[in-house]
Amino acid sequence: MSTSKAITLTLFITTTLLASCDAAANATTKPLFPAILIFGDSTVDTGNNNYPLPTIFRAEHFPYGMDLPDGKANGRFSNGKLISDIIATKLNIKEFIPPFLQPNLSDQDILTGVCFASAGAGYDDLTSLSTQAIRVSEQPNMFKSYIARLKGIVGDKKAMEIINNAFVVVSAGPNDFILNYYDIPSRRLEYPFISGYQDFILKRLENFVRELYSLGVRNVLVGGLPPMGCLPIHMTAKFRNIFRFCLEHHNKDSVLYNEKLQKLLPQIEASLPGSKFLYADVYNPMMEMIQNPSKYGFKETKRGCCGTGFLETSFMCNVFSPVCQNRSEFMFFDSIHPSEATYNVIGNRLDPLIRGKFQA
């Protein structure tokens, strides 16, 4: 073979290999969904409560957000990313999900999805009466405004295509039980047994996701309850002993609720053509972290990183609060909300389940 032919063949093979690598890379990085849409409470609120709302449940002040790239608080109740941001990143949609009430949203923000969640919200409207958050039942109204803007950008047909194929995260529930049943028993007269209140909440959840379906949503991840008896603030409020053991009867309530939710979601899916619903288990990963903290790099699971870690959250966790040096060693950032390290563990668990369900 002549030298010129050898060079030509080498260049051809090299070009082909590079093209194959580029194609493989594009296949790997291509988003599984065109957009991500978030509904719920403070576990997924990326900053809606920063904007004109008469609520004290805000996180636009230090030390919240201290481990974000710019080190600035932006409304996320953690030291860094929330679980919704982590999911969006793993799905190659975007790094951070902006709140819908943010006034300077770009068209690209709208095209790839936003957050409608509000810290302090719950499925029970009574929850937001005390927190002044945007009720979960009100969040579809924000979604309708989003759809209108999306249609203005890409037209009606393309907008509904994006909505139909978007990935939707719904995360709420703990506020309902803590505020209306455990700490302030306002619902106990109506529901003397916790199972009755659970059924009420699950019916509210079902009505909510059915409304989202009527607006075009098809792919939904629904979060279960965490081990509520292990939340630092809850252990403080129900103080039993100096060792701060989890409140097992409240954890059992979480388990029962989650079992009911896991049975409900397939029933909803079967009744809504073209829909896919996936249960997000946060209870078991969190219990594993509590029971075997060193496996996940944690040294503290019974209190938050901010202040004493027993009570501080929202306005009580502020610029004057001492903050732990190694946030990755704390399971909770404040007395309620997980640290970014915890959300990363949960995100790693959920990612293959999401791909398995929605790529099928």
From Swiss-Prot:
Keywords: Glycoprotein, Hydrolase, Lipid degradation, Lipid metabolism, Secreted, Signal. The keyword Secreted applies. Gene3D superfamilies: SGNH hydrolase. Its EC number is 3.1.1.-. It is found in: Secreted. It holds the Pfam family Lipase_GDSL. SUPFAM superfamilies: SGNH hydrolase. One of its GO terms (biological process) is lipid catabolic process. This is GDSL esterase/lipase At2g31550. It comes from Arabidopsis thaliana. The lineage of its organism: Eukaryota, Viridiplantae, Streptophyta, Embryophyta, Tracheophyta.
